[in-house]
Amino acid sequence: MFTRRFIPVVQSTKQNIGKYVRKDARFTLLTYNMLSPSYMWPQVYTYVAEPYKNWSYRHRLLEKELLNTFKADIMCLQEMTARDYEDYWHDSIGVDVNYGSKFISKTPPKYWKKPVKDMDGVSIFYNLAKFDFISSSGIYLNQLLNVFNQRELKYLYNKKVTLTDGASNVIGEDSLLDVLKGKNQVCLFVSLRHKETGTIFVVLNTHLYWKYDEVKLTQCMIIMRELSKIIKQLLPGDVKGQERVKILFTGDLNSTRDSLVVNFLQGQIVSHGDLNLINPMRPYLDRCVYDDIPKDYFVHTCYSGKLKGIFDYVWYHDSDFLLTKILTGNEVSDELLASNQLGLPNENHPSDHIPLLTEFKIL
């Protein structure tokens, strides 16, 4: 096994040079897609040896990672099932080690035949020694299409999406609006106060749909517009206070660095005729961790057979947070190459994603 390195980040951002940072303003943050046992599709993970598909085996590795190796002050987890949260993680990370937590489950899709508790969702765990809990909310993205005005809804209705099956074969066409209504993705918002500095931030965790760029882009727009509302509600009537609210947006965005979603988050205007859409949260989110590290630190964060790429993100603003350390990921690619393995999970890695672990300082 090639050991990943949790190494310092050399900063070149001019506005942060010489800025005073308190030692106690440091915290660690992790985002990680755990790979739900319900999604260990036999037709996808043909390259995984049978013992390493076993949920009990994978769960033991996840326990070691999250409770010991990579335990962060804030942990944002995707594809955690409701059953697993209630039966294990709520107490193991929460009660036993003094972490608070919140969870939201997706609604079961039409094809779902398993118990509702086996449906996955997203969770956020936070170290109560460092943070006070303020509030939380969870949203179902297909129920918030009212964030769009009539012109935008008309575009969503008229825009056609070419539908494909799991093997990328074309199976039909539908309006973008109807496709969005049929998807069950969620987003979790948790507002925390950092004990030592009094800083308030909102932590977001989501897992966007795995295909159709326009669907992922629209889901991201919904999240950003809802976040804008949450910030206004967090400190009502206190404009100066709102300026102190900092944002950490994490999750599996199923989107590469050159995707529509990432371009939108970076502030690129999305234009459709005379319809121009822009990220309302750009003043709060101006970069992701990959903007502050050498390109060779990561090859992929997802190693799901033929589906590989950098899909997992932490977004923030460089006037709010300074990225000080990151757990490199290129060693995983080297490990797979050396062992002639197609992807993850394997004996050492319980998920087809690798955890993205960071350390930040509050500015």
UniProtKB/Swiss-Prot annotation:
Asked if the Swiss-Prot or TrEMBL record annotates the protein with the keyword Mitochondrion, the reply is yes
* Gene Ontology CC terms: mitochondrion
Query: Could you say which EC number(s) this protein's record lists?
Result: 3.1.-.-
Location in or out of the cell: Mitochondrion
Transit peptide extent on chain: 1-23
The molecular function GO annotations come to: 3'-5'-RNA exonuclease activity; endonuclease activity
Q: What is this protein called?
A: RNA exonuclease NGL1
In its UniProt entry, the species of origin is given as Saccharomyces cerevisiae (strain ATCC 204508 / S288c) (Baker's yeast)
Highest classification ranks of the organism:
Eukaryota, Fungi, Dikarya, Ascomycota, Saccharomycotina
